[in-house]
Amino acid sequence: MSQYTVVTGAAGFIGANIVKALNERGETNIIAVDNLTKADKFKNLTDCEIADYLDKTEFLSVVEEGVLDGSVAAIFHEGACSDTMETDGRYMMDNNYRYSGALLKFCQDEGAQFLYASSASVYGSGRVFSESRECESPLNVYGYSKFLFDQSVRRLWAERTAQIAGFRYFNVYGPREQHKGRMASVAFHFFNQYRAEGRVKLFEGCDGYPNGEQRRDFVSVEDVVRVNMWFLDHPEVSGIFNVGTGRCQSFNDVAVATVNACRAAEGQDALTLDEMQAQGLIGYVAFPEALKGKYQSYTEADTAALRRAGYDGSFYSVEEGTARYIERLLQS
């Protein structure tokens, strides 16, 4: 039997999309690893083919006991606590930092590819989003857990025995995120608000930005998966890379794209932001006190390192990617 490909966080948002992409390449010898305490996540895997499922704790034990020695070709490590508002730092560091370190060691010992999820949250409130230490200053313990693991990876560069590729995901949106609750993308929340209430609510301005004009690099999960598959096919390429479009867009842009995608499905004409505001389709609510000082009002991936590595794929704009996503949501 061929070696396994392992996907941690396999029932989660990005992990499930990676499993599906592997299936589409003919790969089914997949070990899916996750924590199904929130059982609804299983729905993300019902249209996927896998060889086995292991709980995240069981998988770590299997790895440390040597049961999988010689049996793993690659690990996509997407599993983590991704709640940026989580305040239990001890849990966050154990789950995101220590666990990742154990899997990295296993892959280096085994000569297996290790492709893992980092995060744009490592950059904090900075204005430059380049993969270098001077740009990194996380605002919360989630970002710190990702930052610290990236630092441990950097210390291994000279001695690495197999591919290590870390991906600093920016604001990812797309199918299979329905279980994420408050941490789901704004496109998902806007879609549900519009369907339920006929309008969309955004945060008022902050950090000098007008209402809804805070800007992020919103990237489709379809593009994120394509980047992961490219690195799987290029085991000679290692590094830490931003994964975003390289172009920031406003939350207003996402809201307009979402509403217009819904309107198009109903045979209605597209509207501008001004028209939506005038008709009460887009409104604003006070910026939450709990997020002040912990919120990234601006992100934009510097994709130069990704391009230098050889990846030349294009990325969907908010308008393109959101339209594709809303079409999927309307079909579900």
UniProtKB/Swiss-Prot annotation:
Entry's cofactor comment: Binds 1 NADP(+) per subunit.
CDD domains tied to this protein: ADP_GME_SDR_e
Catalytic activity: ADP-D-glycero-beta-D-manno-heptose = ADP-L-glycero-beta-D-manno-heptose
Residues binding NADP(+), per UniProt: 13-14, 34-35, 41, 56, 78-82, 95, 146, 172, 180
GO BP of this protein: ADP-L-glycero-beta-D-manno-heptose biosynthetic process; carbohydrate metabolic process
Domain of life: Bacteria
Residues of the active site: 142 (proton acceptor), 180 (proton acceptor)
Keyword Cell membrane in record: no
Keywords: Carbohydrate metabolism, Isomerase, NADP
Entry EC number(s): 5.1.3.20
Disulfide bonds: none
Binding residue positions for substrate: 171, 182, 189, 203-206, 216, 295
NCBIfam families attached to this UniProt entry: heptose_epim
Domain remarks: Contains a large N-terminal NADP-binding domain, and a smaller C-terminal substrate-binding domain.
Family: Belongs to the NAD(P)-dependent epimerase/dehydratase family. HldD subfamily.
Protein's job: Catalyzes the interconversion between ADP-D-glycero-beta-D-manno-heptose and ADP-L-glycero-beta-D-manno-heptose via an epimerization at carbon 6 of the heptose.
This protein's name: ADP-L-glycero-D-manno-heptose-6-epimerase
Lineage: Bacteria, Pseudomonadati, Pseudomonadota, Betaproteobacteria, Nitrosomonadales
